[in-house]
A protein has these predicted regions:
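Signal-transmission linkers at sensory-effector interfaces
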Residues: 1-25, 36, 56-58, 121, ...
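Alpha-helix N-cap/helix-start motif at coil-to-helix transitions, marked by capping-box chemistry
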Residues: 1-4, 75, 109-110, 141
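Amphipathic alpha-helical coiled-coil segments that mediate homodimerization
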Residues: 9-17, 22-41, 45, 76-80, ...
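GAF sensory/regulatory domain recognition
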Residues: 31-35, 44-68
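Helix-to-coil/beta transition segments that act as allosteric "coupling" elements at the rims
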Residues: 86-131, 137
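Allosteric cytosolic regulatory segments
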Residues: 141-148
Length: 155
């Protein structure tokens, strides 16, 4: 990945965080720049809705039927996105648990730490065809941090 691509991700992500009025618009802008600059076919941001359910608050690259299917799959506590909320550790380049789409998935927790306490606010989930290099992973982690701040800001 070029340093120009990295700069574009961080600049546009920071601008989306600072200037979007709604959380969905801010997050979709962040996802859009990821899809444009990295080899990401689709991306979603999922947050707990206050109960035991998860909701998709932003997506890019997914048709409505795929979004509906993912929303249904999130009811399964064994789904990788649901597992990332419980065990907030990034996973990269893992095969999908359900057929269809790109060959690999990556899941990054959206966390913030306040007063020494870390809170999981959601998950950045990506579908892609090729493994992610170390620099791409670092940029995705930075984007997940920006997304976490956006979610926290609008809670």
């Amino acid at each position: 990945m070029s340093s120009e691509a990295a700069r574009e991700i961080l600049v546009r992500g920071a601008r989306a965080l600072a200037h979007a009025d709604a959380v969905g618009a801010s997050l979709e802008s962040m996802l859009g720049v990821l899809a444009e600059t990295l080899d990401i076919e689709s991306a979603v941001i999922v947050v707990p809705d206050g109960s035991d359910r998860m909701v998709i608050v932003a997506s890019v690259g997914l048709a409505d039927p795929a979004i509906a299917g993912l929303a249904e799959a999130l009811h399964d506590p064994g789904h990788p996105i649901a597992k990332t909320v419980v065990d907030p550790v990034p996973s990269f380049d893992v095969p999908p648990t359900r057929p269809g789409g790109p060959a690999l998935r990556s899941h990054l927790p959206l966390t913030v730490t306040r007063d020494g306490t870390t809170t999981v606010l959601g998950v950045l989930a990506l579908a892609h065809h090729r493994p992610l290099d170390a620099e791409s992973r670092r940029l995705l982690e930075a984007t997940a941090d920006l997304a976490a701040v956006a979610v926290e800001r609008h809670r």
